[in-house]
Amino acid sequence: MNQSAAEIIREFGPFPGVHKVNGVTYDGQQVWIAVGEKLNAIDPASGKTLRSIDVAAHAGTAFDGQHLFQIADDRIQKIDPKTGHVIATIPLPVGGGFSGLAWAEGTLWVGQCEDRKIYQLDPQTGTILRTIESKRFVTGVTWVDGELWHGTWEGDESDLRRVDSRTGEVLEKIEMPPGVGVSGLESDGGDQFFCGGGGSGKVRIVRRPRRGSAAGRGSESTLDSKSK
């Protein structure tokens, strides 16, 4: 397993009126953060808040290229970012405690924190398509370059983990500094992760380590036909 210390490139916040960052996503231009009863759009260049959507935003956030998805208690809300309207709701599995949320290859991936699980869900019905066991609390989920990553946070220890999307085996780990937690995880599609900072009210940008092309190909996990 590859292991490294996190390279924090920069951080934003705390933001006015924001006491906790619950989830993070990126729409290609703006970083969206879930802050309780609002979704705030942040300029990743300046860190300025550009706009807000009044919607329950209690945990993970995702973007499918057109719509935002936001965890609110026992459901996922599908939101039109242009109008701010909730246009559909998707039931979550029983159990509660959901955290990270990601969109990949036509399906939703949701973390269940204290149960240490990641679910792949049908975005129309909420049906569970796959369950992955984790060894740590799951506090954020993202996909990039065919790789499944999730955040963890227990006590003062937090890290980012690349895992096999079928077995949950940890393939790579990026350790955050002591006391710096991750609550929400998103990739920019390149070499950067956006990490929510929980009660710090901050968003941090962490560099995704580069790997040799041969090593990278050998250790990547890709989605199977069920998620395409």
Region annotations inferred by a language model:
Residues F15-G28, V55-G65, P93-E105, K135-G146, ...:
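Beta-rich, blade/repeat-based domains predominating
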Residues V31-E37, Q70-D74, V110-D115, H150-G155, ...:
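Conserved beta-strand positions in repeat-built beta-propeller and related beta-rich domains
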Residues G36-P44:
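Beta-propeller domains
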Residues N40-A41, Q77, Y119, R161, ...:
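WD40 beta-propeller blade core
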Residues D43-G47, D80-G84, D122-G126, D164-G168, ...:
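Short loop/turn segments that connect beta-strands within beta-propeller blades
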Residues V182-K228:
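Blade-level signature of beta-propeller repeat domains, shared across WD40, Kelch, NHL, RCC1
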